[in-house]
Amino acid sequence: MFVLHSYSKLPNINEYAKAKSTPLDVFVWGTGSMCELGLGPSAKNKEVKRPRLNPYLTEEKLGGTKIVDFAVGGMHTLALDGKNRIWSWGGNDSEVLGRDTCQAKEVLKDIDGKNGNDDDDDDEDGDLNEAESTPALVENLPEGEIVQLAATDNLSAALLSNGDVYSWGCFRCNEGLLGFLRDEIKLQKTPLKIKELKKHCPIMRSVKIILLALDSKEWMPGVNGQQYQLGRRILERHRYRSLEPQQFGLYNIKYIASGDFHCFAIDHSHNVYAWGLNQYGQCALTGDNGELEDGSVLMKPTLIPELSHKGIKEIAAGEHHTLALTEDGQVYAWGRYDMKEIGIPKDKLPKSTFKINTGTHGSFSFLQNLFAVKIKTIGVGSHHSFAVTEDGVVYAWGFAETYGPGLGPSIDDVEKPTRIVNTATKNEDILLIGAGGQFSVSGGVKFEDEEKAEVRLDKYEDLE
């Protein structure tokens, strides 16, 4: 059993997960107006324009251990340390942090002399909630080895080595709160064992979706299916059934991935399937000339010929765009283009690029490799993207107004993959990367030999 994140390597779905053990330095950047960066309550930490080492997650602060894995949701992050503890930080309106943060909110009110009705409560220059903005331990976790984590917009989950799944938070739909488990629990504040998911694998991080597979069959629990993310139709009168795991017709599956409103699966014959929203071609299925219908949707898992048998081992999907990484280190991108999500300059777009009604380049589906160097992992936020080279250098592109790419003070969207250059990560081999709506997180290992880092720097400067 295993949990699969958007930055994970392709596993064998029949193998049991093993907890990661490599100690990581954790870096954060972007906009943290909802406490997403985990840098503490000071207002000056709301915007970080390049990767910054999180001082609360160092070996000293964690009592002689480091973070070994993390999962990034829309506005929060979960991090697993070497002592089998989960740390959380970020917005907690949906109880995704798995711990009480209400007391800190009350303290802030008392200090400021405010109440919940004051217009000044949303002052952008004020300090953040200390309990939400500072990493702290998830409460009431069970005994047992935690092997992987998952985080979405409004939900958190942890997988144990014995196959148990614990979760907390909620699911939301277009109208607001949908619930947590059937119609019985609306908000779950601390980890709860999900009995229906015993021996299920894997869990995949997405904004609104958790995908699971049992014996290589696809299952979908706890999802708003209004955009057909479930791969099946949900009638309004049975809406709470979307909060129950149900098989929906895919077999022999070895890999799954999901974006905000679309999903992918790869079977053991290397066929790739997609379903969900496709109005920007994010499912990699368009007409012969790249045309798309407004509101295009794949209502059930659909074979995607252009992606099948390409050796794809990893898929990372955002709100309306998708990246894929192949076994030989190539990266493909497709989907929405108007915020530069796919990393291809405008003058390099093929004629088949579809334009939305405004005349803006809306979607792109033709597959071409983005890099001349080998890539080892990929990651995406809602509208920005990352690729990490085999020696740990990060390239970023996409929507930059909230500094999600980590490339500095410019708020101009980044049209093509651009190398992150800063002091904090200069000597780091980045191993993991993930992102939410307006922030990003990476984890790396520092080179013992600084000369090796200098050689790497010279290599990429020569390439550029």
Curated annotation (Swiss-Prot):
Cellular component per GO, a single term: chromatin
Compartments reported by the entry: Nucleus
Taxonomic source organism: Candida albicans
Listed name of the protein: Protein RCC1
Short name of any one Pfam family annotated for the protein: WD40_RLD
Biological process according to GO: cell division; nucleus organization; poly(A)+ mRNA export from nucleus; protein import into nucleus; ribosomal subunit export from nucleus
Function as written in the Swiss-Prot or TrEMBL entry: Promotes the exchange of Ran(SPI1)-bound GDP by GTP. Involved in the control of mitosis. Regulates a variety of nuclear events, including mitotic check-point, chromosome decondensation and mRNA processing/transport.
Classification via SUPFAM superfamilies: RCC1/BLIP-II
GO MF terms, alphabetically ordered: guanyl-nucleotide exchange factor activity
RCC1 repeats: 23-82, 84-135, 162-216, 269-327, 329-390, 391-445
Residue stretches of biased makeup (Acidic residues): 118-130
Coiled coil stretches, renumbered: none
Gene coding for it: RCC1
Major location (coarse): nucleus
Positions of region (Disordered): 111-130
Disulfide-bonded cysteines: none
